[in-house]
Amino acid sequence: MLLPWLILIPFIGGFLCWQTERFGVKVPRWIALVTMGLTLALSLQLWLQGGYSLTQSAGIPQWQSEFDMPWIPRFGISIHLAIDGLSLLMVVLTGLLGVLAVLCSWKEIEKYQGFFHLNLMWILGGVIGVFLAIDMFLFFFFWEMMLVPMYFLIALWGHKASDGKTRITAATKFFIYTQASGLVMLIAIQALVFVHYNATGVWTFNYEELLNTPMSNGVEYLLMLGFFSAFAVKMPVVPLHGWLPDAHSQAPTAGSVDRAGILLKTAAYGLLRFSLPLFPNASAEFAPIAMWLGVIGIFYGAWMAFAQTDIKRLIAYTSVSHMGFVLIAIYTGSQLAYQGAVIQMIAHGLSAAGLFILCGQLYERIHTRDMRMMGGLWSKMKWLPALSLFFAVATLGMPGTGNFVGEFMILFGSFQVVPVITVISTFGLVFASVYSLAMLHRAYFGKAKSQIASQELPGMSLRELFMILLLVVLLVLLGFYPQPILDTSHSAIGNIQQWFVNSVTTTRP
Protein backbone atom coordinates (compact mmCIF):
# COMPACT_ATOMS: atom_id res chain seq x y z
CA MET A 1 0.00 0.00 0.00
CA LEU A 2 3.04 2.25 0.22
CA LEU A 3 3.36 2.54 -3.58
CA PRO A 4 0.41 4.91 -4.27
CA TRP A 5 1.59 7.14 -1.41
CA LEU A 6 5.02 7.53 -3.03
CA ILE A 7 3.20 9.25 -5.91
CA LEU A 8 0.40 10.95 -3.95
CA ILE A 9 2.62 12.64 -1.34
CA PRO A 10 4.46 14.91 -3.87
CA PHE A 11 1.14 15.81 -5.57
CA ILE A 12 -0.59 16.63 -2.27
CA GLY A 13 2.52 18.47 -1.00
CA GLY A 14 2.70 20.52 -4.21
CA PHE A 15 -0.95 21.54 -3.91
CA LEU A 16 -0.40 22.57 -0.26
CA CYS A 17 2.67 24.64 -1.28
CA TRP A 18 0.53 26.53 -3.78
CA GLN A 19 -2.30 27.18 -1.33
CA THR A 20 -0.18 28.15 1.71
CA GLU A 21 1.85 30.90 0.02
CA ARG A 22 -0.61 33.45 1.48
CA PHE A 23 0.67 32.59 5.00
CA GLY A 24 4.23 33.66 4.16
CA VAL A 25 6.87 33.09 1.49
CA LYS A 26 8.81 30.61 3.63
CA VAL A 27 5.86 28.26 4.22
CA PRO A 28 5.90 26.61 0.73
CA ARG A 29 9.66 25.94 1.05
CA TRP A 30 9.24 24.06 4.32
CA ILE A 31 6.22 22.11 3.09
CA ALA A 32 8.17 21.10 -0.06
CA LEU A 33 11.17 20.04 2.04
CA VAL A 34 9.01 17.95 4.41
CA THR A 35 7.15 16.43 1.41
CA MET A 36 10.33 15.29 -0.35
CA GLY A 37 11.88 14.19 2.95
CA LEU A 38 8.83 11.99 3.58
CA THR A 39 8.99 10.57 0.03
CA LEU A 40 12.70 9.75 0.50
CA ALA A 41 11.99 8.15 3.90
CA LEU A 42 9.21 5.97 2.41
CA SER A 43 11.44 4.81 -0.46
CA LEU A 44 14.24 3.95 2.00
CA GLN A 45 11.69 2.04 4.12
CA LEU A 46 10.79 -0.02 1.02
CA TRP A 47 14.50 -0.68 0.43
CA LEU A 48 15.02 -1.84 4.02
CA GLN A 49 12.10 -4.29 3.69
CA GLY A 50 14.31 -6.27 1.29
CA GLY A 51 13.05 -8.96 -1.06
CA TYR A 52 14.84 -7.67 -4.16
CA SER A 53 16.76 -10.90 -4.84
CA LEU A 54 13.71 -12.72 -6.21
CA THR A 55 14.22 -14.35 -9.60
CA GLN A 56 12.05 -16.56 -11.75
CA SER A 57 13.64 -19.00 -14.14
CA ALA A 58 11.43 -17.85 -17.01
CA GLY A 59 12.78 -14.32 -16.71
CA ILE A 60 9.27 -12.95 -16.06
CA PRO A 61 9.30 -9.78 -13.90
CA GLN A 62 9.15 -10.50 -10.18
CA TRP A 63 7.88 -7.61 -8.08
CA GLN A 64 8.80 -6.94 -4.47
CA SER A 65 5.59 -4.97 -3.92
CA GLU A 66 2.51 -4.46 -6.09
CA PHE A 67 -0.68 -2.36 -6.11
CA ASP A 68 -3.51 -3.04 -8.58
CA MET A 69 -6.87 -1.24 -8.77
CA PRO A 70 -9.25 -1.28 -11.78
CA TRP A 71 -9.57 2.10 -13.49
CA ILE A 72 -11.22 1.68 -16.93
CA PRO A 73 -12.09 -2.07 -16.96
CA ARG A 74 -13.67 -2.00 -20.43
CA PHE A 75 -10.24 -1.44 -22.02
CA GLY A 76 -8.23 -3.36 -19.44
CA ILE A 77 -6.75 -0.18 -17.94
CA SER A 78 -5.91 -0.29 -14.23
CA ILE A 79 -3.91 1.69 -11.70
CA HIS A 80 -1.20 -0.95 -11.59
CA LEU A 81 1.97 -0.02 -9.71
CA ALA A 82 4.86 -2.35 -8.93
CA ILE A 83 8.42 -2.06 -7.68
CA ASP A 84 11.54 -4.17 -8.12
CA GLY A 85 15.23 -3.46 -7.55
CA LEU A 86 15.65 -1.30 -10.66
CA SER A 87 12.65 0.95 -10.07
CA LEU A 88 13.40 1.16 -6.33
CA LEU A 89 16.89 2.61 -6.96
CA MET A 90 15.44 5.18 -9.36
CA VAL A 91 12.74 6.17 -6.82
CA VAL A 92 15.35 6.58 -4.04
CA LEU A 93 17.47 8.75 -6.39
CA THR A 94 14.37 10.84 -7.19
CA GLY A 95 13.61 11.35 -3.49
CA LEU A 96 17.20 12.33 -2.69
CA LEU A 97 17.57 14.78 -5.59
CA GLY A 98 14.09 16.12 -4.84
CA VAL A 99 15.24 17.13 -1.35
CA LEU A 100 18.37 18.75 -2.84
CA ALA A 101 16.31 20.55 -5.52
CA VAL A 102 14.19 22.17 -2.79
CA LEU A 103 17.29 23.11 -0.77
CA CYS A 104 19.23 24.58 -3.70
CA SER A 105 16.32 26.86 -4.68
CA TRP A 106 15.94 28.15 -1.09
CA LYS A 107 17.37 31.61 -1.84
CA GLU A 108 17.26 31.56 -5.66
CA ILE A 109 13.47 31.71 -6.12
CA GLU A 110 11.80 34.89 -4.89
CA LYS A 111 8.58 35.28 -6.92
CA TYR A 112 5.57 32.93 -6.95
CA GLN A 113 7.11 30.62 -4.33
CA GLY A 114 3.95 28.52 -3.98
CA PHE A 115 3.47 27.94 -7.71
CA PHE A 116 7.19 27.19 -8.13
CA HIS A 117 7.08 24.44 -5.51
CA LEU A 118 3.79 23.11 -6.93
CA ASN A 119 5.54 22.58 -10.29
CA LEU A 120 8.66 21.12 -8.68
CA MET A 121 6.66 18.62 -6.58
CA TRP A 122 4.44 17.60 -9.50
CA ILE A 123 7.47 16.92 -11.72
CA LEU A 124 8.89 14.64 -9.01
CA GLY A 125 5.51 12.94 -8.48
CA GLY A 126 5.25 12.32 -12.23
CA VAL A 127 8.78 10.88 -12.36
CA ILE A 128 8.04 8.47 -9.49
CA GLY A 129 4.85 7.49 -11.35
CA VAL A 130 6.92 6.65 -14.45
CA PHE A 131 9.21 4.41 -12.37
CA LEU A 132 6.31 2.57 -10.68
CA ALA A 133 3.61 2.27 -13.39
CA ILE A 134 3.38 -1.06 -15.22
CA ASP A 135 0.07 -0.34 -16.89
CA MET A 136 1.04 1.17 -20.25
CA PHE A 137 -1.76 3.77 -20.20
CA LEU A 138 -0.79 4.87 -16.68
CA PHE A 139 2.89 4.95 -17.68
CA PHE A 140 2.09 7.25 -20.61
CA PHE A 141 -0.10 9.43 -18.36
CA PHE A 142 2.81 10.07 -15.98
CA TRP A 143 5.31 10.39 -18.86
CA GLU A 144 3.34 13.31 -20.33
CA MET A 145 2.46 14.75 -16.92
CA MET A 146 6.11 15.62 -16.23
CA LEU A 147 6.26 18.00 -19.20
CA VAL A 148 3.79 20.74 -18.27
CA PRO A 149 5.27 21.63 -14.84
CA MET A 150 8.78 21.54 -16.36
CA TYR A 151 7.62 23.97 -19.06
CA PHE A 152 6.42 26.42 -16.38
CA LEU A 153 9.61 25.94 -14.37
CA ILE A 154 11.77 27.07 -17.31
CA ALA A 155 9.36 29.70 -18.69
CA LEU A 156 8.61 31.51 -15.42
CA TRP A 157 11.79 31.11 -13.34
CA GLY A 158 14.45 30.56 -15.99
CA HIS A 159 17.50 32.78 -16.59
CA LYS A 160 18.39 34.52 -19.82
CA ALA A 161 21.20 32.67 -21.60
CA SER A 162 24.58 34.32 -22.21
CA ASP A 163 23.92 34.13 -25.98
CA GLY A 164 20.71 36.17 -25.60
CA LYS A 165 18.16 33.37 -26.09
CA THR A 166 15.07 33.75 -23.92
CA ARG A 167 13.73 31.25 -21.40
CA ILE A 168 10.39 31.08 -23.28
CA THR A 169 12.26 29.85 -26.39
CA ALA A 170 14.01 27.15 -24.34
CA ALA A 171 10.78 26.06 -22.62
CA THR A 172 8.86 25.89 -25.91
CA LYS A 173 11.65 23.92 -27.60
CA PHE A 174 11.70 21.43 -24.72
CA PHE A 175 7.91 21.08 -24.81
CA ILE A 176 7.68 20.55 -28.58
CA TYR A 177 10.50 17.96 -28.69
CA THR A 178 9.14 15.89 -25.80
CA GLN A 179 5.46 16.28 -26.72
CA ALA A 180 6.02 15.21 -30.34
CA SER A 181 8.06 12.15 -29.34
CA GLY A 182 5.49 11.28 -26.66
CA LEU A 183 2.76 11.32 -29.30
CA VAL A 184 4.72 8.76 -31.35
CA MET A 185 4.98 6.54 -28.25
CA LEU A 186 1.21 6.85 -27.62
CA ILE A 187 0.52 5.61 -31.15
CA ALA A 188 2.96 2.71 -30.58
CA ILE A 189 1.27 1.78 -27.25
CA GLN A 190 -2.19 1.84 -28.86
CA ALA A 191 -0.95 -0.23 -31.80
CA LEU A 192 0.61 -2.79 -29.42
CA VAL A 193 -2.69 -3.09 -27.49
CA PHE A 194 -4.61 -3.48 -30.78
CA VAL A 195 -2.20 -6.18 -32.05
CA HIS A 196 -2.63 -8.01 -28.72
CA TYR A 197 -6.44 -7.74 -29.00
CA ASN A 198 -6.39 -9.13 -32.55
CA ALA A 199 -4.33 -12.11 -31.39
CA THR A 200 -6.10 -12.88 -28.09
CA GLY A 201 -9.48 -11.10 -28.14
CA VAL A 202 -8.63 -9.33 -24.86
CA TRP A 203 -8.23 -5.56 -24.38
CA THR A 204 -5.40 -4.93 -21.94
CA PHE A 205 -2.75 -2.32 -21.16
CA ASN A 206 -1.09 -4.64 -18.61
CA TYR A 207 2.68 -4.80 -19.22
CA GLU A 208 2.99 -8.45 -18.11
CA GLU A 209 0.28 -9.61 -20.54
CA LEU A 210 1.61 -7.49 -23.41
CA LEU A 211 5.03 -9.18 -23.03
CA ASN A 212 3.59 -12.27 -24.75
CA THR A 213 1.98 -10.48 -27.70
CA PRO A 214 2.56 -12.45 -30.93
CA MET A 215 3.44 -10.17 -33.86
CA SER A 216 5.35 -10.19 -37.15
CA ASN A 217 8.94 -8.90 -37.29
CA GLY A 218 7.96 -5.83 -39.35
CA VAL A 219 5.25 -4.75 -36.90
CA GLU A 220 7.57 -5.38 -33.94
CA TYR A 221 10.29 -3.19 -35.50
CA LEU A 222 7.89 -0.30 -36.17
CA LEU A 223 6.46 -0.39 -32.64
CA MET A 224 9.96 -0.58 -31.15
CA LEU A 225 10.94 2.56 -33.12
CA GLY A 226 7.89 4.34 -31.67
CA PHE A 227 9.06 3.62 -28.12
CA PHE A 228 12.73 4.28 -28.93
CA SER A 229 12.01 7.72 -30.43
CA ALA A 230 10.32 8.92 -27.22
CA PHE A 231 13.11 7.59 -25.00
CA ALA A 232 15.84 8.85 -27.37
CA VAL A 233 14.54 12.44 -27.15
CA LYS A 234 14.41 12.37 -23.35
CA MET A 235 17.79 10.61 -22.92
CA PRO A 236 18.90 12.50 -25.18
CA VAL A 237 20.42 10.67 -28.14
CA VAL A 238 22.18 12.69 -30.87
CA PRO A 239 20.61 14.06 -33.16
CA LEU A 240 17.46 14.40 -30.98
CA HIS A 241 19.22 16.41 -28.28
CA GLY A 242 18.48 19.94 -29.55
CA TRP A 243 16.28 20.91 -26.58
CA LEU A 244 18.79 19.95 -23.85
CA PRO A 245 21.49 22.69 -23.85
CA ASP A 246 18.95 25.54 -24.03
CA ALA A 247 16.65 24.00 -21.43
CA HIS A 248 19.56 23.42 -19.03
CA SER A 249 21.19 26.81 -19.46
CA GLN A 250 17.95 28.74 -18.96
CA ALA A 251 16.34 26.61 -16.22
CA PRO A 252 16.60 27.53 -12.53
CA THR A 253 19.08 25.39 -10.57
CA ALA A 254 16.34 23.10 -9.19
CA GLY A 255 15.08 22.46 -12.73
CA SER A 256 18.57 21.55 -13.95
CA VAL A 257 19.16 19.23 -10.98
CA ASP A 258 15.87 17.43 -11.65
CA ARG A 259 16.42 17.22 -15.39
CA ALA A 260 20.02 15.99 -15.38
CA GLY A 261 19.64 13.86 -12.26
CA ILE A 262 16.25 12.26 -12.83
CA LEU A 263 14.45 13.12 -16.11
CA LEU A 264 17.23 11.72 -18.33
CA LYS A 265 17.11 8.50 -16.28
CA THR A 266 13.43 7.96 -17.09
CA ALA A 267 14.50 7.38 -20.71
CA ALA A 268 17.17 4.79 -19.85
CA TYR A 269 14.70 3.13 -17.46
CA GLY A 270 12.05 3.07 -20.22
CA LEU A 271 14.43 1.34 -22.63
CA LEU A 272 15.36 -1.30 -20.03
CA ARG A 273 11.85 -1.87 -18.68
CA PHE A 274 9.70 -1.57 -21.82
CA SER A 275 11.59 -1.33 -25.12
CA LEU A 276 13.87 -4.38 -24.72
CA PRO A 277 11.42 -6.87 -23.12
CA LEU A 278 8.40 -5.93 -25.28
CA PHE A 279 10.33 -5.97 -28.58
CA PRO A 280 13.38 -8.23 -28.08
CA ASN A 281 13.91 -9.30 -31.71
CA ALA A 282 13.52 -5.78 -33.08
CA SER A 283 15.79 -4.42 -30.33
CA ALA A 284 18.47 -7.00 -31.16
CA GLU A 285 18.22 -6.07 -34.85
CA PHE A 286 18.38 -2.35 -34.00
CA ALA A 287 21.21 -2.78 -31.44
CA PRO A 288 24.18 -1.93 -33.77
CA ILE A 289 22.49 1.33 -34.85
CA ALA A 290 21.67 2.25 -31.23
CA MET A 291 25.23 1.52 -30.08
CA TRP A 292 26.78 3.63 -32.85
CA LEU A 293 24.38 6.44 -31.90
CA GLY A 294 25.78 6.05 -28.37
CA VAL A 295 29.35 6.36 -29.68
CA ILE A 296 28.43 9.48 -31.68
CA GLY A 297 26.80 10.91 -28.55
CA ILE A 298 29.93 10.31 -26.45
CA PHE A 299 32.22 12.18 -28.86
CA TYR A 300 29.75 14.84 -29.99
CA GLY A 301 28.82 15.66 -26.38
CA ALA A 302 32.50 15.91 -25.40
CA TRP A 303 33.47 18.14 -28.36
CA MET A 304 30.48 20.43 -27.88
CA ALA A 305 31.15 20.67 -24.14
CA PHE A 306 34.71 21.79 -24.83
CA ALA A 307 33.50 24.53 -27.21
CA GLN A 308 31.02 26.15 -24.77
CA THR A 309 31.51 29.47 -23.00
CA ASP A 310 28.38 29.17 -20.80
CA ILE A 311 29.26 26.88 -17.88
CA LYS A 312 25.72 25.40 -17.64
CA ARG A 313 25.64 24.59 -21.36
CA LEU A 314 29.00 22.85 -20.92
CA ILE A 315 27.59 20.62 -18.16
CA ALA A 316 24.48 19.95 -20.28
CA TYR A 317 26.63 18.57 -23.10
CA THR A 318 28.52 16.34 -20.64
CA SER A 319 25.15 14.64 -20.00
CA VAL A 320 24.85 13.83 -23.72
CA SER A 321 28.31 12.26 -23.55
CA HIS A 322 27.67 10.22 -20.39
CA MET A 323 24.27 8.92 -21.47
CA GLY A 324 25.99 7.63 -24.65
CA PHE A 325 27.74 5.04 -22.45
CA VAL A 326 24.40 4.02 -20.93
CA LEU A 327 22.84 3.61 -24.41
CA ILE A 328 25.70 1.33 -25.50
CA ALA A 329 25.31 -0.76 -22.33
CA ILE A 330 21.54 -1.18 -22.75
CA TYR A 331 21.86 -2.73 -26.22
CA THR A 332 24.74 -5.14 -25.47
CA GLY A 333 22.58 -7.77 -23.76
CA SER A 334 25.37 -8.22 -21.19
CA GLN A 335 24.44 -8.56 -17.50
CA LEU A 336 27.66 -6.82 -16.43
CA ALA A 337 27.07 -3.87 -18.78
CA TYR A 338 23.46 -3.56 -17.54
CA GLN A 339 24.65 -3.42 -13.93
CA GLY A 340 27.23 -0.82 -14.98
CA ALA A 341 24.48 1.22 -16.65
CA VAL A 342 22.51 1.31 -13.38
CA ILE A 343 25.60 2.46 -11.43
CA GLN A 344 26.39 5.03 -14.16
CA MET A 345 22.83 6.39 -14.07
CA ILE A 346 23.00 6.89 -10.29
CA ALA A 347 26.57 8.28 -10.34
CA HIS A 348 25.75 10.66 -13.21
CA GLY A 349 22.62 11.79 -11.36
CA LEU A 350 24.71 12.65 -8.28
CA SER A 351 27.68 14.25 -10.09
CA ALA A 352 25.56 16.28 -12.55
CA ALA A 353 23.35 17.47 -9.67
CA GLY A 354 26.50 18.53 -7.77
CA LEU A 355 27.87 20.48 -10.75
CA PHE A 356 24.55 22.26 -11.37
CA ILE A 357 24.16 23.16 -7.68
CA LEU A 358 27.72 24.57 -7.65
CA CYS A 359 26.91 26.51 -10.86
CA GLY A 360 23.86 27.99 -9.17
CA GLN A 361 25.94 29.00 -6.13
CA LEU A 362 28.58 30.57 -8.39
CA TYR A 363 25.88 32.46 -10.32
CA GLU A 364 24.43 33.86 -7.06
CA ARG A 365 27.87 35.34 -6.28
CA ILE A 366 29.12 36.67 -9.64
CA HIS A 367 25.80 36.93 -11.61
CA THR A 368 27.20 35.43 -14.80
CA ARG A 369 27.65 31.94 -16.24
CA ASP A 370 29.96 33.12 -19.03
CA MET A 371 33.40 31.59 -18.41
CA ARG A 372 34.98 34.44 -20.41
CA MET A 373 34.00 36.72 -17.50
CA MET A 374 35.47 34.48 -14.81
CA GLY A 375 39.06 33.40 -14.15
CA GLY A 376 41.15 33.66 -11.00
CA LEU A 377 38.28 32.64 -8.72
CA TRP A 378 40.26 29.94 -6.86
CA SER A 379 41.70 32.44 -4.39
CA LYS A 380 38.56 34.59 -4.14
CA MET A 381 36.25 32.18 -2.30
CA LYS A 382 36.50 29.24 0.08
CA TRP A 383 35.36 25.66 -0.57
CA LEU A 384 33.46 26.20 -3.83
CA PRO A 385 36.42 25.91 -6.26
CA ALA A 386 37.82 22.83 -4.47
CA LEU A 387 34.43 21.10 -4.50
CA SER A 388 34.06 21.99 -8.19
CA LEU A 389 37.40 20.24 -8.75
CA PHE A 390 36.05 17.09 -7.04
CA PHE A 391 32.92 16.97 -9.21
CA ALA A 392 34.93 17.70 -12.36
CA VAL A 393 37.24 14.73 -11.73
CA ALA A 394 34.23 12.59 -10.76
CA THR A 395 32.63 13.46 -14.11
CA LEU A 396 35.72 12.35 -16.02
CA GLY A 397 35.58 8.97 -14.22
CA MET A 398 38.23 9.23 -11.51
CA PRO A 399 38.85 5.93 -9.65
CA GLY A 400 37.28 6.14 -6.21
CA THR A 401 34.07 7.73 -7.50
CA GLY A 402 30.88 6.00 -8.63
CA ASN A 403 31.33 7.26 -12.20
CA PHE A 404 34.50 5.16 -12.57
CA VAL A 405 32.74 1.98 -11.38
CA GLY A 406 29.84 2.54 -13.79
CA GLU A 407 32.01 3.29 -16.83
CA PHE A 408 34.42 0.44 -16.07
CA MET A 409 31.58 -2.11 -15.77
CA ILE A 410 29.93 -0.83 -18.96
CA LEU A 411 33.18 -1.06 -20.96
CA PHE A 412 34.14 -4.41 -19.42
CA GLY A 413 30.71 -5.92 -20.11
CA SER A 414 30.45 -4.42 -23.61
CA PHE A 415 33.92 -5.59 -24.66
CA GLN A 416 32.79 -9.24 -24.67
CA VAL A 417 29.98 -8.38 -27.11
CA VAL A 418 31.16 -5.42 -29.24
CA PRO A 419 34.95 -4.99 -28.85
CA VAL A 420 35.32 -2.41 -31.67
CA ILE A 421 32.61 -0.08 -30.32
CA THR A 422 34.00 -0.47 -26.79
CA VAL A 423 37.57 0.44 -27.81
CA ILE A 424 36.38 3.50 -29.75
CA SER A 425 34.12 4.72 -26.93
CA THR A 426 36.99 4.35 -24.43
CA PHE A 427 38.63 7.34 -26.12
CA GLY A 428 35.58 9.35 -25.07
CA LEU A 429 36.96 9.16 -21.53
CA VAL A 430 40.07 11.03 -22.72
CA PHE A 431 37.89 13.83 -24.09
CA ALA A 432 35.98 13.89 -20.78
CA SER A 433 39.20 14.88 -19.02
CA VAL A 434 39.77 17.63 -21.63
CA TYR A 435 36.42 19.38 -21.13
CA SER A 436 36.37 18.88 -17.34
CA LEU A 437 39.81 20.39 -16.84
CA ALA A 438 39.14 23.14 -19.42
CA MET A 439 36.05 24.16 -17.42
CA LEU A 440 38.09 24.37 -14.20
CA HIS A 441 40.90 26.28 -15.88
CA ARG A 442 38.63 28.87 -17.49
CA ALA A 443 36.53 29.48 -14.37
CA TYR A 444 38.96 29.23 -11.46
CA PHE A 445 42.53 29.77 -12.67
CA GLY A 446 44.44 32.43 -14.61
CA LYS A 447 43.78 36.15 -14.28
CA ALA A 448 40.44 37.66 -13.29
CA LYS A 449 38.68 38.67 -16.52
CA SER A 450 36.05 40.98 -15.02
CA GLN A 451 35.52 43.42 -12.16
CA ILE A 452 33.32 40.99 -10.20
CA ALA A 453 35.79 38.10 -10.49
CA SER A 454 38.58 40.25 -9.04
CA GLN A 455 36.70 40.96 -5.76
CA GLU A 456 36.61 38.85 -2.59
CA LEU A 457 33.46 36.73 -2.78
CA PRO A 458 31.36 35.27 0.07
CA GLY A 459 32.06 31.65 1.04
CA MET A 460 29.51 28.84 1.20
CA SER A 461 26.74 28.77 3.80
CA LEU A 462 26.03 25.67 5.93
CA ARG A 463 23.02 24.81 3.74
CA GLU A 464 25.14 24.95 0.57
CA LEU A 465 27.97 22.96 2.15
CA PHE A 466 25.58 20.28 3.46
CA MET A 467 24.08 19.67 0.00
CA ILE A 468 27.42 19.36 -1.74
CA LEU A 469 29.19 17.32 0.95
CA LEU A 470 26.27 14.86 1.00
CA LEU A 471 26.75 14.29 -2.75
CA VAL A 472 30.54 13.97 -2.29
CA VAL A 473 30.09 11.30 0.41
CA LEU A 474 27.55 9.35 -1.68
CA LEU A 475 29.75 9.43 -4.82
CA VAL A 476 32.80 8.21 -2.89
CA LEU A 477 30.73 5.51 -1.15
CA LEU A 478 29.41 4.38 -4.52
CA GLY A 479 33.00 4.33 -5.83
CA PHE A 480 34.38 2.21 -3.00
CA TYR A 481 31.37 0.08 -2.08
CA PRO A 482 28.82 -0.28 -4.90
CA GLN A 483 27.74 -3.74 -3.67
CA PRO A 484 24.38 -2.73 -2.07
CA ILE A 485 23.31 -1.14 -5.39
CA LEU A 486 24.47 -4.16 -7.39
CA ASP A 487 22.69 -6.59 -5.02
CA THR A 488 19.45 -4.61 -5.18
CA SER A 489 19.36 -4.34 -8.98
CA HIS A 490 20.87 -7.77 -9.77
CA SER A 491 17.64 -9.75 -9.88
CA ALA A 492 15.62 -7.15 -11.82
CA ILE A 493 18.42 -6.62 -14.35
CA GLY A 494 18.96 -10.40 -14.59
CA ASN A 495 15.27 -10.88 -15.45
CA ILE A 496 15.38 -8.22 -18.17
CA GLN A 497 18.61 -9.60 -19.64
CA GLN A 498 17.33 -13.21 -19.50
CA TRP A 499 14.03 -12.31 -21.15
CA PHE A 500 15.82 -10.31 -23.85
CA VAL A 501 18.45 -12.98 -24.63
CA ASN A 502 16.00 -15.93 -24.46
CA SER A 503 13.47 -14.20 -26.71
CA VAL A 504 16.14 -13.42 -29.28
CA THR A 505 17.66 -16.90 -29.32
CA THR A 506 14.28 -18.67 -29.42
CA THR A 507 11.12 -17.85 -31.33
CA ARG A 508 8.84 -15.31 -29.75
CA PRO A 509 5.77 -16.77 -27.95
For each feature predicted by the language model, list its residue ranges.
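Structural signature of hydrophobic alpha-helical transmembrane segments
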Residues: 1-9, 83-94, 137-149, 220-231, ...
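Transmembrane helix-loop-helix hairpins at membrane boundaries of multipass inner-membrane proteins
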Residues: 1-2, 16-118, 199, 204, ...
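Central hydrophobic cores of alpha-helical transmembrane segments in multi-pass inner-membrane proteins
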Residues: 4-19, 34-46, 91-105, 123-124, ...
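C-terminal ends of transmembrane helices
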Residues: 15-22, 98-110, 152-166, 234-249, ...
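Alpha-helical multi-pass transmembrane bundles of energy-transducing inner-membrane proteins
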Residues: 23-25, 118, 122, 126-215, ...
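Juxtamembrane/interfacial segments at transmembrane-helix boundaries in multi-pass membrane proteins
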Residues: 50-78, 163-171, 182-241, 271, ...
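Predominantly late transmembrane helices and immediately cytosolic-facing juxtamembrane segments
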Residues: 238, 352-355, 422-456
